Amino acid sequence: MAQSSLAQTTEELDKRNGFKDIKLATEVHQYEGLEYKEEIADELFKTLSVYVKKKGYYESIGSIKIHDVEVLAYKGEVYQIKVITEKNPKLYRGLKKAFGEPTFSPRGDNYYWSTDNLGLTFGNNAKSKLQLLYTSYVMKGRLKEDKKEEIEDISEDF
């Protein structure tokens, strides 16, 4: 008799496309639980907008306390979501149940799940905290298109 696995696959990661109601590659202004903090310089994107969670929003993942949520946006769209939580082994078990077995990266000393559209890394953040980092590969693709257009504009301006 074959047993069915309760563990999901990375298809579930694609389906969720982000953290809670914050979805990657969507307009950042639609999330009332986020507020603008600042613009930062970025090696890849040149400039990114930083948004942080408002008080009373994104307080926990089940019983696990969330310390911080930071969202990076490129041209108003969500590129990356960073979630900092208290250290709790239940978080890793929950991620495995939701998205399947991760790959371990000894170089980054973290675990990751990856699809064609996004990646999720999980690891330590300081001694007593954990970090989830969702990154949109779709937004990286848009950046490449923007850079091609910029080069095209420059080449036509001679």
Predicted regions and their residues:
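Non-cytosolic coordination micro-motifs
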Residues: 8-51, 80-158
